[in-house]
């Protein structure tokens, strides 16, 4: 370190000192019409939602040429300090808003992190940073160009970098580089961080600047439009600072940036998103600070014991919790006093946005991760965050009634085709819908579809006809309809989004034409046998048919199989579906996961064989389903509620089905539908996620008392269902 280093005082910085709040200057008016100039002079919360994007471009985004000049000025400072032998700069990294490329027009913040070879460990930074700041200050003030722009306040050294129209208040930070040669942090890095913090009694997050390289990398992967949304949130926050008497803590600005990233990641992940939906979602999250718990596992995870213990300690801290994705000790969301003020302001802006048309709903984002929900709180989690309320369900019902009325009375009125019946399917009909998931399935049984063959060959033309009629009639019905583009040449389903004045938000629909295989006597076991016999004969004659090809014909049976179950079991199904959605989001590139219906059936199976009671423990049920997913290679699950082994043709077919490659999960409504699918889907990815979830707080009653799964066989045999048939394979637990 040099002979002069040991003589320095050991009293160091108490962490990143607070930056002074900068009063936001008036926005520059750019290309605004006379009647729009007021937009740049008013509170952002008063800007009409349809004008927000224009407002960002005209008032918040800095000029690119100005930023280039700022970069040149900052690079000049870097070069000057790198040339100073006594500072021993190994590497310079730009941080703060400047480094994250979330700079607001006019004035913004930034850091210049100087990784120095003089600091060999975290403790050195704590001991000697102030002395090194003295040296840097002297070097800059000795330069004619910088002596007037350098300011020193205790442990804070700043340089004002300004050009006409843009300025950056740059904080200079000599720092230890824990990454050294490696670009990615190992668990050892975070172990050293925790040990060093304990030794020198450092504050949480005090060494977060050491990870500025990771922070910069974390933000650079996100699209420019997301950074536009971040600018909007930051500008709103800056305007609020002018209203508050006490300056808010600087980490709060970073917390809002991270919260905006979280909202986009969890709810959208598309580059060309709607800014209004984005800001609604962020405001919705801000308005519930006592529920906020946000973190990432990009740079650290739960695998190492030291890191895991620290991470779980942080995640179980009082809300709000927003962890720095590069430093697990740094909760940038703490300080509930200001969050309450923010929550009130966010709700006020949210209410004003709701008055603007068209209404753009929030993305489906929860304020806290499911992973850290304690086992005893799972039922409350389901009720608060997953179970839809009556208003939502009535909304869906009204939308379904609109489409059903159109199909029955209008769509085929000028043809000989009759609508035999319309069945409401999907999660809404089964009673397992999730909050904010405004979708509905409608199955329309047509007289002209009188066989499985006719359904196979003609359904695409009826999809086109329904679309044609809906397009023609939407004005008469005062509807707004946006059709999804099908990737299939001959689509089996018509997917569209419905908007109406009678609906508070848009609703997504799937309409499927179907053959009425069960007829009006669907409760008659004989009619089901006939329908299944025809289906099996068709499969025997056509090798190209995939299993479940005609499952739409048995939607009523699928619906009734789930809908009649206890309310608490349907809550567990919601929990499993939410878990599945989280797994789905993590898959990059998108993987072909098993259908959600397979997980629903597995949940019912786990409950039937593990509990069977209305008052079961939700954590135990959840744990059991994950255990079955982990053991997917052994799974063989089926039911005999709608078909069984008694009839010869059915018995032979079922014995063939259950001898297929695992996993096998037969649709209880359609014996040809194996939603387990063997190798068809990526069960191994789902199993990997399930294993990682075993360390979740959901399964911890006490530190050394994990929740245990129910004892459920992974293999269902004909004998276990009461059939007098020698088991194909033995039951396995």
From Swiss-Prot:
It comes from the Eukaryota. Residues 373-713 are annotated as: OAS domain 2. Its cofactor is Mg(2+). SUPFAM superfamilies: Nucleotidyltransferase, PAP/OAS1 substrate-binding domain. One of its GO terms (cellular component) is cytoplasm. Mg(2+) binds at residues 439, 441, 510. InterPro entries: 2-5-oligoAdlate_synth_1_dom2/C (IPR018952), 2-5OAS_C_CS (IPR006117), 2-5OAS_N_CS (IPR043518), NT_2-5OAS_ClassI-CCAase (IPR006116), NT_sf (IPR043519), Polymerase_NTP_transf_dom (IPR002934). GO terms for molecular function: 2'-5'-oligoadenylate synthetase activity; ATP binding; double-stranded RNA binding; metal ion binding. It is found in: Cytoplasm; Cytoplasm, Perinuclear region. It is an enzyme of class 2 (transferase). Coiled coil: none annotated. Keywords: Acetylation, Antiviral defense, ATP-binding, Cytoplasm, Glycoprotein, Immunity, Innate immunity, Lipoprotein, Magnesium, Metal-binding, Myristate, Nucleotide-binding, Nucleotidyltransferase, Repeat, RNA-binding, Transferase. The modification N6-acetyllysine is found at residue 408. Signal peptide: none annotated. Belongs to the 2-5A synthase family. This is 2'-5'-oligoadenylate synthase 2. The lineage of its organism: Eukaryota, Metazoa, Chordata, Craniata, Vertebrata. The gene is Oas2.
């Amino acid at each position: 370190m040099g002979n002069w280093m040991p003589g320095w005082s050991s009293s160091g910085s108490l962490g990143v000192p607070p930056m002074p709040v900068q009063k936001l200057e008036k926005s520059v008016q750019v290309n605004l019409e006379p009647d729009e100039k007021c937009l740049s002079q008013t509170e952002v919360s008063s800007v009409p939602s349809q004008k927000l994007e224009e407002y960002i471009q005209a008032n918040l985004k800095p000029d690119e040429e100005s930023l280039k000049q700022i970069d040149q000025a900052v690079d000049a400072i870097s070069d000057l300090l790198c040339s100073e032998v006594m500072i021993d700069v190994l590497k310079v990294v730009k941080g703060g808003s400047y480094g994250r490329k979330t700079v607001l027009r006019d004035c913004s913040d930034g850091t210049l992190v100087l990784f120095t070879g003089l600091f060999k460990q975290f403790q050195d930074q704590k001991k000697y940073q102030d002395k090194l700041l003295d040296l840097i200050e002297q070097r800059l003030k000795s330069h004619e160009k910088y002596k007037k722009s350098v300011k020193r306040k205790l442990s804070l050294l700043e340089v004002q970098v300004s050009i006409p129209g843009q300025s950056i208040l740059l904080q200079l930070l000599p720092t230890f580089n824990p990454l050294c040669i490696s670009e990615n942090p190992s668990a050892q890095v975070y172990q050293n961080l925790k040990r060093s913090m304990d030794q020198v009694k450092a504050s949480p997050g005090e060494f977060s600047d050491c990870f500025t390289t990771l922070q910069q990398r974390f933000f650079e992967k996100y699209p420019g439009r997301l950074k536009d949304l971040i600018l909007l949130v930051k500008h709103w926050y800056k305007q609020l600072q002018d209203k508050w008497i006490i300056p808010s803590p600087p980490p709060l600005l970073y917390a809002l940036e991270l919260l905006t990233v979280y909202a986009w990641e969890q709810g959208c992940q598309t580059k060309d998103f709607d800014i209004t939906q984005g800001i609604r979602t962020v405001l919705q999250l801000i308005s519930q600070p006592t529920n906020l718990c946000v973190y990432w596992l990009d740079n650290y995870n739960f695998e190492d014991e030291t890191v895991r213990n620290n991470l779980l300690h942080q995640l179980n801290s009082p809300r709000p919790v927003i962890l720095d994705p590069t430093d697990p000790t740094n909760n940038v969301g703490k300080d509930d006093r200001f969050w309450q003020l923010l929550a009130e302001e966010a709700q006020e802006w949210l209410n004003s946005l709701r008055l603007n048309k068209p209404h753009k709903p929030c993305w489906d984002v929860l304020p806290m991760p499911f992973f850290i929900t304690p086992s005893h709180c799972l039922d409350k989690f389901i009720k608060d965050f997953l179970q839809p309320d009556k208003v939502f369900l009535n909304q869906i019902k009204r939308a379904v009634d609109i489409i059903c009325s159109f199909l029955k009375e209008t769509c085929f009125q000028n043809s000989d085709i009759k609508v035999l019946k319309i069945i409401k399917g999907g999660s809404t009909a089964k009673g397992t819908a999730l909050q904010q998931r405004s979708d509905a399935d409608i199955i329309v049984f047509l007289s002209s579809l009188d066989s499985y063959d006719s359904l196979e060959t003609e359904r695409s033309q009826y999809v086109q006809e329904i679309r044609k009629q809906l397009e023609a009639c939407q004005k008469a019905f005062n509807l707004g309809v946006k059709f999804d583009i099908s990737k299939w040449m001959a689509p089996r389903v018509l997917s569209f989004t419905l908007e109406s004045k009678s609906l508070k938000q848009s609703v997504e629909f799937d309409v499927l034409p179907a053959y009425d295989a069960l007829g009006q006597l669907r409760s008659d076991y004989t009619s089901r046998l006939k329908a299944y016999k025809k289906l099996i004969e068709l499969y025997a004659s056509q090798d190209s048919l995939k299993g479940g090809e005609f499952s739409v014909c048995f939607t009523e049976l699928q619906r009734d199989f789930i809908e009649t179950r206890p309310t608490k079991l349907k809550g567990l199904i919601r929990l499993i579906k939410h878990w599945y959605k989280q797994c789905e989001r993590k898959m990059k590139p998108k993987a072909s996961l098993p259908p959600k219906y397979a997980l629903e059936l597995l949940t019912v199976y786990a409950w039937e064989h593990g509990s069977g009671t209305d008052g079961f423990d939700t954590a135990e049920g959840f744990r059991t389903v994950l255990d079955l997913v982990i053991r997917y290679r052994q799974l063989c699950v089926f039911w005999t509620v709608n078909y069984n082994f008694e009839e010869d043709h059915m018995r032979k077919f079922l014995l063939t089905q259950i001898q297929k490659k695992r996993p096998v999960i037969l649709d209880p409504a359609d014996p040809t539908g194996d939603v387990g699918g063997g190798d068809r889907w990526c069960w191994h990815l789902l199993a990997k996620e399930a294993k990682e979830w075993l360390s979740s707080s959901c399964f911890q009653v006490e530190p050394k008392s994990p929740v245990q799964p129910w004892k459920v066989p992974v293999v269902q045999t004909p004998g276990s269902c009461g059939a007098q048939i020698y088991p194909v394979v033995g039951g396995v637990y």
